[in-house]
Amino acid sequence: MSASPTAGQAGLSYRDAGVDIDAGDALVDRIKPFAKRTMREGVMAGIGGFGALFELSKKFQEPVLVSGTDGVGTKLKLAFQLNRHDTVGQDLVAMSVNDILVQGAEPLFFLDYFACGKLDVDTAATVIQGIARGCELAGCALIGGETAEMPSMYPDGEYDLAGFAVGAVEKKKIIDGSTITPGDVVLGLASSGAHSNGYSLVRKIIEVARPDLNADFHGQRLQDAIMAPTRIYVKPLLSLIETLPVKGMAHITGGGLTENVPRVLAQDVTAVLKRDAWTLPPLFQWLQAQGRVADDEMHRVFNCGIGMVVIVAKEDAERAIRHLQAAGEAVWQIGEIRERAEGEAQTIVV
């Protein structure tokens, strides 16, 4: 007995169920040139296969793989609201590659996951173009990914992102903060904005303050300042690591300054950060004023203008600053390491 449709009856298709295979194929064709620009030594097979292949370089003697995964958080809600999808791809890459960088790892390759209810090829291609741009900045290959069209799972016009980065570091060169001692210097590298953290509070402030997001804000639109892509620190910091001993690094993400710096400190030391060592950028001044946010809350939610912290010996501080400035980074000496008193927090902003 045949299960085929009888004469005059149209059978159901995947498109009837809400999944457009042709749109998915069109997206793959659109993004292949973006991915191709990210290819690097080691890539054996990339987009299109069941699995991507990567061969570790012979320059590594005792390689340790370092992996990281992250998303963009509720910054995506603003992307939907503003219908701008050109920055969140770089955000996605930055969140993972900056994380694995702090252990001294060179990012090797990246994979992305794009999930939606109905696939809009133009939107998805714009996002993935941003992902490829982030991979170029980080020097890693966009080696594969997944586009999941799942009807009824997401509202029309919305999507979610996840990213996965894998890097490698020589075992003897892993940076874990174990050599940090009192007297060491804390350097802060400038952020490009709020990066990809604290956006639930950003959105709440926008909801309460109801600003004109197209209004001029220090020479750009307010929405441009809010949606600025996360800075990728990979190339300048890998160069610094080859130049002088870096004792520890902290990517300032969710938890702000006061909760991320302790992640690289031993229990017997404290980082004392001086708030007057750098100027709070205009975006954070605006957020604090419009939301009447307390200083302590700012420091544990936002990066407050410092996207990456680097800890070096006092005698290496000036050389590190000069090296990073020559690489195009804005950097300040923002604090020092001291012995931790009993019951004292591991990061203090004074």
Swiss-Prot record:
The keyword Electron transport does not apply. It is found in: Cytoplasm. Pathway: Purine metabolism; IMP biosynthesis via de novo pathway; 5-amino-1-(5-phospho-D-ribosyl)imidazole from N(2)-formyl-N(1)-(5-phospho-D-ribosyl)glycinamide: step 2/2. GO terms for molecular function: ATP binding; phosphoribosylamine-glycine ligase activity; phosphoribosylformylglycinamidine cyclo-ligase activity. It comes from the Bacteria. Its EC number is 6.3.3.1. One of its GO terms (biological process) is adenine biosynthetic process. InterPro entries: PurM-like_C_dom, PurM-like_C_sf, PurM-like_N, PurM-like_N_sf, PurM_cligase. Keywords: ATP-binding, Cytoplasm, Ligase, Nucleotide-binding, Purine biosynthesis. Pfam families: AIRS, AIRS_C. It catalyses: 2-formamido-N(1)-(5-O-phospho-beta-D-ribosyl)acetamidine + ATP = 5-amino-1-(5-phospho-beta-D-ribosyl)imidazole + ADP + phosphate + H(+). Its main location: cytoplasm. HAMAP family: AIRS (MF_00741). Belongs to the AIR synthase family. This is Phosphoribosylformylglycinamidine cyclo-ligase. It comes from Cupriavidus necator (strain ATCC 17699 / DSM 428 / KCTC 22496 / NCIMB 10442 / H16 / Stanier 337). The gene is purM.
